[in-house]
A protein has these predicted regions:
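Transmembrane-helix signature of polytopic, membrane-embedded enzymes
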Residues: 99-103, 124-147, 166
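Transmembrane signal-anchor helices characteristic of membrane glycosylation enzymes that use polyprenol
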Residues: 12-44, 51-62, 71, 244-262, ...
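Transmembrane helical bundles and short interhelical boundary loops of multi-pass, membrane-embedded
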Residues: 256-257, 336-339, 418-494
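Short acidic/glycine- and proline-prone juxtamembrane loop motifs at membrane-interface regions
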Residues: 150-163
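Transmembrane-helix motifs of polytopic, lipid-linked glycan transferases
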Residues: 107-132, 170
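Membrane-lumen/periplasm interface segments of specific transmembrane helices
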Residues: 218-221, 240-349, 483-484
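Membrane-interface anchor segments at the N-terminal boundary of transmembrane helices
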Residues: 104-115, 304-376, 382, 403
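Perimembrane helix-loop-helix junctions
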Residues: 3, 177-179, 208-247
Length: 494
């Protein structure tokens, strides 16, 4: 019995996370089966691409009449569609079991999204372990993401966001692994493959590419400065290994951009050609030339934060739909629950930011806060520009690429608050902030940011506090499910 107890103490967090992920995956799948298609934004238009691939066994042109939307005059075949490629095996499996109608194939594509969401939760846990989080913080980081209403909603229907979240987490895991292994060739290949996957996910995730480049060169610069490297070795580290990363990423995503460039006269992104196609085939009011964007009306971009447009105040709608707005942006969870969610997350996030700044107060460590900040902020900047210059879309899903990082920081913040409670109590409790340094590291070398951890002796009061935090978040999600999701968004697939 004592052996089992000790084993549970050592691996209790892993078991808890496994149970949590399985539970959330089952919930995502159940919702995917029962979410009406009218409540799944853009799903019908986005499904045209995987349905075309399934039917014809080849990739579509973006301007193929079979997939051009009759209202918008364009298709998702111009932009990256990694999520469609991931859905195809699930659609084949559905056909294998005798379900090849449109409804069954759509559900199969939705299930592929549920799988992506569950794998992403696993990666968030892996990242927390790479960062040497406590068991409580590791479990909480997965819980915060998996039970965020908007994340659950995005897992329940076919979209590009879940692959965006997953690929961003893959980049983080690969970069941390590369740092730990001094950017071995295998690590560089892993970073390249993850960046290639990210490039096929969604344009709003591309901030992670810039963040990964910054992380690589900052770590390499510090490592090379601390060590005794020859000129040739420095060239290998700073030039040849980035080439390995680039080639590896192109092996995954290069075909798409080369194909686009060939098909659309050098337009490897596909956006300009998509706009030209929309100008030609869209209904009159939806043609790009007839859209009154804020930019075309002469407004500066910051006007989004000063006044509402079209009855929508951009910051408010982004904030609410970041937490949870379902259907066609018309099913809200209620002001009380927005208040509870936002304040709960804000307390943990602010505490986590303060804790990270305190831990990384040396200049060398502070520099490593830049890449995660870029991952969080660049999607926000892209969303602001898109709403200002192209299409006024105040949607939280466009800025969620970095929420995995925010969930980790928030979990770290709550962990720090619990540690602070122990310091204040001063009863049979101690806090030890310990820097785990690589063996034989001299004082001139950088202290690894991914090897900082807070170790403390637990007591009953702190365990109770941690339990209350977890129970509060689970209860809040349960209330949203019973009062909003089940009555409004669980009406059976149509």
């Amino acid at each position: 019995m004592s052996v089992l107890v000790n084993r549970f103490r050592r691996n209790g967090d892993t078991l808890a996370v496994a149970i949590l992920i399985v539970f959330m995956f089952v919930f995502y799948v159940c919702w995917a089966f029962h979410l009406p298609s009218l409540f799944a934004p853009d799903e019908t238009m986005r499904m045209d691409v995987p349905l075309y691939i399934f039917k014809h066994g080849c990739l579509p042109r973006g301007d193929d009449p079979e997939i051009i939307n009759r209202f918008w005059g364009t298709s998702y075949g111009f932009s990256v569609y990694g999520s469609s490629l991931f859905a195809i095996p699930f659609m084949w499996a559905s056909e294998l079991f005798g379900y090849a109608d449109i409804t069954s194939l759509t559900i199969a594509a939705r299930i592929s999204n549920c799988v992506l969401a569950a794998i992403n939760l696993v990666l968030i846990y892996v990242i927390s372990k790479q960062l040497r989080f406590s068991k409580f913080a590791s479990v909480l980081s997965v819980l915060l993401l998996g039970m965020l209403p908007q994340y659950a909603f995005l897992a329940a229907y076919f979209n590009s966001e879940q692959l965006e979240f997953l690929s961003t987490s893959c980049v983080i895991v690969a970069c941390l692994n590369g740092k730990r292994n001094c950017w071995s060739y295998g690590s560089c290949v892993a970073v390249g493959l993850s960046l290639g996957l990210l490039a096929l996910s969604y344009y709003f995730a591309y901030g992670a590419i810039i963040a990964a480049i910054c992380f690589f060169y900052m770590d390499q610069a510090l490592r090379l400065r601390a060590g005794n490297f020859s000129h040739r070795e420095k060239m290998v580290e700073l030039v040849f290994k980035p080439v390995v990363v680039f080639v590896s990423s192109m092996a995954v995503c290069g075909w798409f951009f080369i194909r686009n460039a060939i098909l659309y006269n050098g337009d490897f992104i596909g956006m300009p050609t998509s706009s030209k196609t929309a100008e030609k085939f869209a209904v009159t009011e939806l043609k790009p030339s007839n859209r009154n964007t804020l930019k075309s009306q002469g407004y500066p971009f910051w006007v989004l934060f000063k006044q509402p447009f079209y009855g929508i105040y951009w910051p408010e709608w982004v904030y609410k739909s970041f937490i949870g707005v379902f259907g066609g942006m018309n099913i809200f969870i209620g002001e009380t629950y927005y208040f509870l969610y936002s304040n709960f997350l804000l307390v943990g996030l602010l505490s986590g930011v303060v804790g990270a700044l305190l831990i990384c107060k040396s200049k060398q460590l502070s520099a490593f806060l830049i890449p995660p900040m870029l991952m969080v902020l660049i999607p926000v900047v892209l969303s602001i520009y898109y709403s200002w210059a192209s299409d006024y879309q105040a949607q939280g899903r466009y800025v969620m690429a970095g929420f995995g990082i925010l969930s980790l920081v928030t979990a770290l913040g709550f962990d720090g608050l619990c540690a602070g409670v122990m310091v204040l109590m001063r009863k049979d409790s101690a806090i030890e902030i310990r820097h785990v340094i690589q063996e034989e590291m001299d004082d001139s070398q950088m202290m690894p940011i991914d090897e900082l951890r807070i170790v403390y002796r637990r007591n009953k009061t702190v365990v109770l506090l941690q339990g209350i935090l977890v129970l509060f978040y689970i209860t809040l999600f349960g209330i949203i499910v019973t009062r909003v999701i089940l009555p409004s968004c669980f009406g059976g697939f149509v």
